[in-house]
Amino acid sequence: MQCPTPEPKGAEVLIRMTAAGVCHSDIHIWEGVYDLGSGNQMTLKDRGVALPLTMGHEISGEVVKVGPEAKAVAPGASCVVYPWLGCGECPTCRRGEENLCAVKARSMGVFMPGGYAEYVLVPHERYCVDLGKLDPAETAPLACSGVTTYSALKKFGARIKDEPVVIMGAGGLGHMALSVLQAMQGKGAIVIDIDAGKRQAAMDAGALTAIDGAAPDASQQIIKATGGGATAVLDLVGSAATLALGIASLRKGGEIVVVGLYGGELKLPIVYLPLRGMGLRGSYVGSLPELKELVGLAQKGTLRPIKVTRQELSQASAALSALKAGKVVGRIVLVP
């Protein structure tokens, strides 16, 4: 689809895309539905997504032109774009949590044009986080998989330094979670995946152990590996099966944070919550301050990059197909 190159106004910034990560959540937009379980679906229209849409929310780029009110960025700068925009005016947005805005979600690549394009118009200069000399292809995934896992792991508090985190899923998010957890000086991770190749890749990336989530005794294996049950489960898949496994593997007082959007529904005996002191919460991407923190870790060399596979922008459909088929280890990043 051909579109005219936008002209930045106000504090807007026009960037030339240098890298755009291909995220599993793009598949939901590509297919047009989210699975709610029991045969129910949420469509793009239900979510407020209008078509046609340029996808891509993991965006790195070079600043080409800025609006007259933009003072903090200049042409030639390399940046990663924070895409999870809200109304910018409500109390939630003023707290720096635009990703949780309930007034007007404006996420790039979801509700407004994203990074699968030659040029991208960023609505305000504050969303351009300077990369310095960091590799744009390696840092583009920080805008979603990076800040998502970072924000989710922070929700566990000090327990990540005391005991291993159980990570459900060894795809791009799983590999990023391993890297982020290491940068946060965590105790380590036990990774769960049904794919043997991905389990081995997780081990190669530093997991303490990797367990087949489809094994009949998977929960017993997790309980044994954690020394009596998990205190922190990060579900990067978000399916009925992974969440049920996480609950079955949880120690009393443990907590599950759900990130993945695979879909389905949860059936849980309510008495489990108080009697087991169990915590269950969702985590939706992350905030702009958290992305800046994460980029800072990368600039210090504390956060190691995950494996990225560069493909031309023209291969976006093929990249999405490969991701849907479970053939991607690490992250596919589209480049011009």
Tell what function each PLM region has.
Residues 4-20, 35-91, 132-134:
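Glycine-rich beta-strand-centered segment in the early N-terminal region that forms part
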Residues 42-57, 87-168:
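NAD(P)H dinucleotide-binding glycine-rich loop of Rossmann-like/cofactor-binding domains
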Residues 127, 133-216, 220-221:
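Mid-domain Rossmann-like dinucleotide-binding core that forms the NAD(H)/NADP(H) cofactor-binding site
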